[in-house]
Curated annotation (Swiss-Prot):
BP-aspect Gene Ontology terms: mRNA processing; protein folding; RNA splicing
Catalytically driven reaction(s): [protein]-peptidylproline (omega=180) = [protein]-peptidylproline (omega=0)
Record's subunit section: Associated with the spliceosome.
Subcellular localization(s) per the UniProt record: Cytoplasm; Nucleus
Keyword terms of this UniProt record: Cytoplasm, Isomerase, mRNA processing, mRNA splicing, Nucleus, Rotamase, Spliceosome
Pfam families: Pro_isomerase
GO cellular component: catalytic step 2 spliceosome; cytoplasm
Protein name: Peptidyl-prolyl isomerase CWC27
Role noted for this protein: PPIases accelerate the folding of proteins. It catalyzes the cis-trans isomerization of proline imidic peptide bonds in oligopeptides. Involved in pre-mRNA splicing.
Residues of the PPIase cyclophilin-type domain: 7-153
Annotated organism of origin: Eremothecium gossypii (strain ATCC 10895 / CBS 109.51 / FGSC 9923 / NRRL Y-1056)
Single GO molecular function: peptidyl-prolyl cis-trans isomerase activity
PANTHER family named among the record's database cross-references: PEPTIDYL-PROLYL CIS-TRANS ISOMERASE-RELATED (PTHR45625), SPLICEOSOME-ASSOCIATED PROTEIN CWC27 HOMOLOG (PTHR45625:SF6)
Length: 303
């Protein structure tokens, strides 16, 4: 179980490499802690650099505060991250390892807490010059703040540091609206505007002109002519062909007449049918009658 007493004061150093939060044993080392806090209140830490590393410690500049010989057996240099100062030197330092040889010779009055120990180690790993002690790019303390003063009546006491002011919102850029105007040429201005209208399909189908064209009277179809040689055509010979094909009255009857048999009774004179047929049809019928007689009374179409 640790024998270290509880801390009673607190302060923060804001460096370029992060925050260093320090808890202070103000009850055990009142004079040293009061001098340390007073130096912060006076602004002595603002702008200083932690520019030296030596003897497993990072050193601050001398002359910032005074140290009294307040040795306490419960406070020892047994780890890294402790804040100490030697009487008569008045130069604070931060340990990087255990420094037991300083017990009884220097005063331990504070300790780093939280992530501050890792910030200290990062500072200690900075590049050093030829002497091996001085940092080439030291960490700078931008400002210091007392968060728990413990003591009353510290002169020039600062208020608790206000949070970093938020960056002012950038003004919103309003885009300029550009209106483009095109001048019309004389030819375009003289041309009358075109009235183009798009009609729907159902409007076109209801157009009377279109329906008249679709449903108008069309000429009657021409009747198909009966094929030549069809049985439907009447086999009627012209009067001239009948006279030629008729057998002579004198003498024995011809073979054609005997095969054809007696001529049927004519319903009337042939001349009555002739005017109803064209000359071409009459010629066709005469040819068929003659061919029938030559075939011996057989139907020329049926063979």
């Amino acid at each position: 179980m640790s024998s270290e007493p509880s801390a009673s004061g607190k302060c923060v150093l804001y460096t370029t490499k992060g925050e260093l939060q320090i808890e202070l044993w103000a009850k055990e080392c009142p004079k040293t802690v009061r001098s340390f806090l007073q130096s912060i209140q006076d602004g002595k830490w603002d702008g200083i650099v932690l520019g030296k590393v030596a003897e497993d410690a990072v050193w601050a500049p001398a002359g910032l505060c005074a140290c009294s010989a307040e040795i306490n057996g419960r406070l020892r240099f047994n780890r890294r991250g402790l804040v100490g100062m030697a009487p008569g030197q008045d130069q604070p330092f931060f340990t990087l390892a255990s420094r037991g040889e300083l017990d009884g010779r220097a005063v331990v009055f504070g300790t780093l807490v939280g992530q501050s120990v890792y910030r200290l180690m990062e500072i200690a790993q900075g590049e050093v010059g030829d002497d091996g002690k001085t940092f080439v790019y030291p960490a700078e303390v931008r400002r210091a703040e007392v968060t728990i003063p413990y003591f009353d009546g510290l002169s020039g006491q600062k208020r608790r540091a206000e949070p970093e002011q938020q960056a002012a919102p950038r003004p919103r850029k309003i885009a300029t609206r550009v209106r483009l105007e095109y001048e019309e040429s004389e030819d375009e201005a003289s041309d009358p505007p075109l009235d183009v209208r798009i009609r729907a399909a159902h409007d076109i189908l209801q157009d009377e002109r279109l329906t008249d064209a679709l449903h108008g009277d069309s000429p009657p179809p021409r009747p198909a002519e009966a094929p030549r040689g069809s049985d439907s055509a009447p086999c009627v010979a012209s009067p001239d062909r009948r006279a030629e094909a008729a057998p002579p009255t004198d003498g024995p009857p011809s073979r054609c007449a005997s095969l054809a048999g007696p001529a049927p009774a004519s319903p009337g004179p042939v001349t009555d049918l002739a005017p109803q047929l064209s000359a071409r049809e009459q010629g066709t019928l005469s040819s068929l009658a003659e061919f029938r007689c030559k075939r011996g009374g057989k139907n020329p179409l049926l063979g």
